[in-house]
């Protein structure tokens, strides 16, 4: 039995056969639209699009399979022997500070005084890198040489510095000694001054100390180097400057101890420092002389010892003196004038 719309049946005809109107009424549309209040969505468009989405079949998704790569494969590998050597050097440097370095300019295998192509760099005497080899030492080497300078026997200092003599240690030893001697000298004058208020610092002591110490440490090695060169010995000027610079290291603590205002203590300190440093200097210089020039070597070493003792006496008698000279100015008006006396001759 077909469905009929009985909306208009109140006209008395029960067989009214008007087809059913399947379109929604205005009231139904209003109710459906109320599902989306305060929006711009149209219910008809929403239902139509939803139906189309349900009718669409899902897209075909193929069964993807991924190929696994082995971890042992190096995609950037190069079979050349140079690259293999570079890789080995990078692995060796991985444990060092800074890690691996891809720049060969800073590699440990490249010397500092060479170019990138392996040729030796050339510097002029007025350029700072020209004197770099004079300071090519570290703290450990300098400390070892300072300790050895206070042990005058059982080793050769020239053998220790033969491969790498330096001027770094001697420069700081001499410079420190210049200022310490000047300060100690002024303190001795202050302690033994009768009037501390009128006492003033003597800046000239720094100049005198520099002339004495630098002159002794540069002039005498230069003269000895000329003599040894004339005797065809293998001692270089740099070796002589190095040993004379380290020789005076023991005078640094000795000068500090000379602040003690006791003459006997100061004499003992200066004597010990001069004997230890003098033996260190004489024994090391006499070693290359004793084989072929025994008599000359004894004379040269005697002169070296005498000059070293002279330096110690200058330090003690001039810089570490315990007394200051007090000059008094006499007033000529207060001095009495001599009165003539009558003398008679006895006949």
Swiss-Prot record:
Keyword presence, Glycoprotein: yes
Membrane-spanning ranges: 167-187, 208-228, 233-253, 256-276, 297-317
Protein name: Protein YIPF1 homolog
Lumenal topology ranges: 188-207, 254-255, 318-347
Cellular component annotations (GO), alphabetically ordered: Golgi apparatus; late endosome membrane
Residues bearing glycans: 322, 326, 342
Stretch list, region Disordered: 1-115
Keyword terms of this UniProt record: Endosome, Glycoprotein, Golgi apparatus, Membrane, Transmembrane, Transmembrane helix
Sample GO molecular function, one term: small GTPase binding
The family this protein is said to belong to: Belongs to the YIP1 family.
Bias type Low complexity, positions: 48-67, 76-104
Positions with biased composition (Polar residues): 34-47, 105-115
Pfam families to which the protein is assigned, alphabetical: Yip1 (PF04893)
Stored InterPro entries: Yip1_dom, Yip5/YIPF1/YIPF2
Organism: Dictyostelium discoideum (Social amoeba)
